[in-house]
């Protein structure tokens, strides 16, 4: 509040002493009062003083060159003193305000240091530091610090046991030592003991990665200080004892080639199960595909053979039907109906009773019409060929009924429609039976010569 009041007074004083007389008056320390009085402008030229507390207390003197000059010069030193004091206070207030502003800026900077504002690069560095504290891992993965501590090996090989170089230390990463194997060296398996040049054990192989012909071996230690205590450095040559079966375990590469492997990950970034693995060898994969293809071809061949056997069976059945139909038609193919009389097996009964000569006529149709028989069609005397036998019975073994006996000699006017058909021939089947032969005409009582029928049989 003091600073604000001082600033208000300074504004008031500046407004009151803004006239030309106050600006032209020198400070009292450098000039005497007489000079100030001589240099003071006349009273008529001075502007009226501003309304202030000082002006109210000291009214201006009456006008006059002699009386006003010394009297008017008297309040000027006080005004200059007040102006100088005001300027001093103004400088003090400015210094105070600058100090207060600097203190406020320092306080604001001290307050802003609690939540620092970081740039993008600083944020990335901070995130990386946090990730180092909390590394990413899968569901069942174990970190190095979660593994049990490595046991200390105090094995020293005697001089009579041969050592063979395995590889050189390529890098050291925290608590891991990476060894790059040499060429033409059989690969060794995990838990193989690795020795230094002084025949002391360096550690056991923790993990193997890289190609089979040129693998990389990893030695795990408890910390980086543990590695330094062992005296292991980059480019150091590491050895193994090939003759010691307790310390050295080999990897059989041929067996590895036969195993199935996959580079794909499975659930939770784990290794896939055996049933989901792919072949690691192209030849084995090709052989398996060929075997599967042969199985499919065998199935197709068996199916085609079954289809062919079914077709053969259908062909045999069709041939049997054709043979049976041809044999069935043989019984009727050679039976010709000439002049209404049959040949073959049914002509025996007609030899004993030939018709008389007077009823014989060269025209068979006229003779049949004269006897009252229906005319016989001659356009197709041969029976039609049926491809299949009737379904109800076999016509080969079923005998046809014998022809009806001839009518008596007296009755000559009966006709063929009065004949009763055989009950067996009226069975319901699709193909009609062959028509019955007409009966022979009755013989004449005066003639018994049967030579007329010799030419027909």
Swiss-Prot record:
GO terms for biological process: box H/ACA snoRNP assembly; positive regulation of telomere maintenance via telomerase; positive regulation of telomere maintenance via telomere lengthening; pseudouridine synthesis; ribosome biogenesis; RNA stabilization; rRNA processing; telomerase holoenzyme complex assembly. The keyword Chloroplast does not apply. Its main location: cytoplasm. Residues 289-302 have a biased composition (Basic residues). Residues 261-270, 327-338 have a biased composition (Basic and acidic residues). The modification N-acetylmethionine is found at residue 1. Keywords: Acetylation, Cytoplasm, Isopeptide bond, Nucleus, Phosphoprotein, Ribonucleoprotein, Ribosome biogenesis, RNA-binding, rRNA processing, Ubl conjugation. The keyword Ribonucleoprotein applies. Disulfide bonds: none annotated. Residues 80-95 have a biased composition (Acidic residues). Residues 430-445 have a biased composition (Pro residues). Residues 358-370, 446-457 have a biased composition (Polar residues). GO terms for molecular function: identical protein binding; RNA binding; telomerase RNA binding. There is a cross-link at residue 303 (Glycyl lysine isopeptide (Lys-Gly) (interchain with G-Cter in SUMO2)). Residues 1-132, 261-303, 316-388, 423-457 are annotated as: Disordered. Belongs to the NAF1 family. During assembly of the complex, component of the small nucleolar ribonucleoprotein particles containing H/ACA-type snoRNAs (H/ACA snoRNPs) which contains NOLA2/NHP2, NOLA3/NOP10, NAF1 and DKC1/NOLA4. Interacts directly with DKC1/NOLA4. This is H/ACA ribonucleoprotein complex non-core subunit NAF1. The lineage of its organism: Eukaryota, Metazoa, Chordata, Craniata, Vertebrata. The gene is Naf1.
């Amino acid at each position: 509040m003091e600073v604000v009041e001082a600033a208000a007074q300074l504004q008031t004083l500046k407004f009151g002493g803004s006239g030309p007389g106050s600006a032209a008056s020198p400070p009292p320390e450098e000039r005497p009062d007489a000079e100030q009085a001589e240099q003071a402008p006349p009273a008529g030229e001075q502007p009226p003083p501003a309304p202030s507390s000082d002006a109210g207390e000291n009214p201006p003197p009456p006008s006059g060159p002699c009386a006003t000059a010394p009297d008017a010069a008297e309040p000027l030193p006080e005004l200059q003193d007040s102006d100088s004091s005001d300027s001093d206070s103004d400088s003090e207030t400015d210094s105070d305000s600058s100090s207060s502003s600097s203190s406020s800026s320092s306080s604001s900077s001290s307050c802003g240091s609690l939540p620092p504002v970081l740039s993008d690069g600083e944020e990335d560095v901070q995130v990386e530091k946090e990730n180092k504290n909390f590394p990413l891992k899968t569901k069942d993965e174990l970190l190095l610090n979660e593994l049990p501590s490595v046991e200390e090996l105090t094995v020293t090989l005697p001089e009579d046991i041969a050592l063979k170089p395995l590889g050189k230390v390529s890098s050291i990463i925290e608590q891991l030592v990476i060894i790059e194997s040499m060429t033409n060296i059989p690969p060794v398996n995990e838990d193989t003991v690795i020795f230094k040049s002084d025949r002391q054990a360096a550690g056991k192989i923790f993990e193997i990665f890289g190609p089979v012909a040129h693998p990389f071996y990893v030695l795990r230690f408890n910390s980086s200080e543990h590695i330094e205590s062992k005296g292991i450095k980059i480019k150091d040559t590491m050895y193994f004892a090939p003759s010691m079966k307790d310390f050295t375990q080999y990897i059989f590469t041929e067996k590895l080639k036969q195993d199935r492997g996959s580079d794909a990950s499975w659930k939770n970034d784990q290794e896939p199960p055996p049933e989901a693995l792919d072949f690691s060898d192209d030849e084995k994969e090709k052989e398996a595909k060929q075997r599967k293809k042969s199985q499919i071809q065998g199935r197709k061949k068996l199916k085609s053979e079954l289809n062919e056997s079914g077709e053969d069976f259908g062909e045999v059945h069709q041939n049997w039907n054709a043979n049976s139909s041809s044999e069935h038609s043989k019984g009727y193919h050679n039976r010709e109906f000439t002049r209404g009389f049959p040949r073959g097996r049914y002509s025996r009964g007609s030899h004993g009773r030939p018709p008389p000569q007077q009823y014989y006529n060269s025209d068979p149709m006229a003779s049949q019409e004269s006897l009252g028989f229906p005319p016989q069609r001659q356009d197709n005397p041969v029976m039609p060929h049926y491809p299949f036998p009737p379904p109800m019975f076999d016509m080969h073994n079923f005998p046809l009924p014998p022809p009806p006996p001839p009518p008596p000699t007296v009755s000559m006017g009966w006709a063929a429609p009065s004949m009763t058909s055989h009950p067996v021939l009226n069975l319901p089947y699709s193909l009609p039976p062959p028509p019955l032969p007409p009966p022979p005409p009755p013989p004449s009582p005066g003639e018994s010569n049967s030579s007329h029928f010799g030419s027909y049989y």
